[in-house]
Amino acid sequence: QNICVSGDLVEADAACYTGDAYLADWPATLDALTAMNFDKLVPGRGAALLTPDAVKKGLAYTRDFVSTLYTSAQEAVAQGMDLNATMKHTRKAMDPKFAQVFIYEHCLPFDVTRAHDEASGVRDPRIWTAERDQEMWHELQK
């Protein structure tokens, strides 16, 4: 039936959770999925994508979300911004496109934290602990 169950690799009108992602690698993975030409796709969040055109749109949406996030973090890190400033910088690019989507406000702090880490050279995601969670919120609320 040519159906892909992508899990959180692809979202449909929902924020991507990237707190433990490899952001630089994600677009290549989306390229591989695109090349498979699925007729239907079940995303991690959002409605099932029931036509090839809807699948293409879901893949493009996810690529845009992840690329906008990571590019913004790379720009911020290149300018020496801390996590709080990176969040503000990233919101300028992300909010106009994604602020209205499901779980955006919930995911964004974790997404920006991971993007800032990866853009700073932290290749492998750090484990989320209660302490790390508190540190993140403290940094973001400065």
Model-predicted regions and their roles:
Residues 13, 72-76, 93, 97:
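Alpha-helix C-capping/helix-to-loop hinge sites
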